[in-house]
Amino acid sequence: MNGTANPLLDREEHCLRLGESFEKRPRASFHTIRYDFKPASIDTSCEGELQVGKGDEVTITLPHIPGSTPPMTVFKGNKRPYQKDCVLIINHDTGEYVLEKLSSSIQVKKTRAEGSSKIQARMEQQPTRPPQTSQPPPPPPPMPFRAPTKPPVGPKTSPLKDNPSPEPQLDDIKRELRAEVDIIEQMSSSSGSSSSDSESSSGSDDDSSSSGGEDNGPASPPQPSHQQPYNSRPAVANGTSRPQGSNQLMNTLRNDLQLSESGSDSDD
């Protein structure tokens, strides 16, 4: 002891127990292993493999972290027996101190030889971890193009509902035409009767004037009267021109009435 206290040991007294390696027929053996070089890529969470061959030749195979090259490291060496060396095992969970006797000391060196088939199969069964790279994340995929949505089309209305049926309008036109025809016929009949009355009255006036002139002697020359042309021309106008215009208008209205009736029949 160099005088420096081991942090794993305290200054209290503990009960020391001899392990199974001190029995007459030991059920366990303990060895020490020394490596000349141990790579940092060795996976300490996985189990390795130790093989003892002929002539105390020892081969140790330790796996590497997944994704490393090579996938494992192989160590080879030999062992030498120990005579008086022991190892102290301290269980910090139970506080128990156990002393075990060392059987041999193994010293190995790193080689380039491949490991055993068991380690190789175990490495192949383990899922490989993808290598971590510092590549930037891929850009997001482009958004798909969407056509602009059309506004909803309102319910279509039938033209028959929007435009009312023309039959009521035709009926109204027929009534108006018939009323006009009746009015014109009444006007023409009244104008004919008035013209005949005026002609008969004018004839009786002429007869009375002629008979009065014969009785009273020679009559003075007739003075021009403004009523005679006024009375005669309206008679002519009422007797001839007025009925002709009314007849033409009646014919036109009748034709229109027939056309409207024929049109309504064709629509039906």
From Swiss-Prot:
Record family assignment: Belongs to the EAF family.
Transcription recorded as keyword: yes
Record function comment: Acts as a transcriptional transactivator of ELL and ELL2 elongation activities.
Keywords carried by this UniProt record: Activator, Nucleus, Phosphoprotein, Transcription, Transcription regulation
Pfam family, one: EAF
GO annotation (BP), single: transcription elongation by RNA polymerase II
GO molecular function terms listed in the Swiss-Prot or TrEMBL record: transcription elongation factor activity
Name of this chain's protein: ELL-associated factor 1
Summary of subunit composition and partner proteins: Component of the super elongation complex (SEC), at least composed of EAF1, EAF2, CDK9, MLLT3/AF9, AFF (AFF1 or AFF4), the P-TEFb complex and ELL (ELL, ELL2 or ELL3). Interacts with ELL and ELL2.
Subcellular location field: Nucleus speckle; Nucleus, Cajal body
Region (Disordered) location: 106-268
Annotated tissue distribution: Strongly expressed in heart, brain, placenta, lung, liver, skeletal muscle, kidney, pancreas, spleen, prostate, testis, small intestine and colon. Poorly expressed in thymus.
Biased composition (Polar residues): 238-268
Basic and acidic residues bias spans: 171-181
Modified residues (Phosphoserine): 165
Major localization listed first in the record, in broad terms: nucleus
Region Necessary for transactivation activity, annotated ranges: 182-262
Compositionally biased intervals (Pro residues): 128-154
Composition bias, Low complexity: 188-213
Cross-referenced InterPro entries: EAF_fam, Tscrpt_elong_fac_Eaf_N
Cellular compartments per GO CC: Cajal body; intercellular bridge; intracellular membrane-bounded organelle; nuclear body; nuclear speck; nucleoplasm; super elongation complex; transcription elongation factor complex
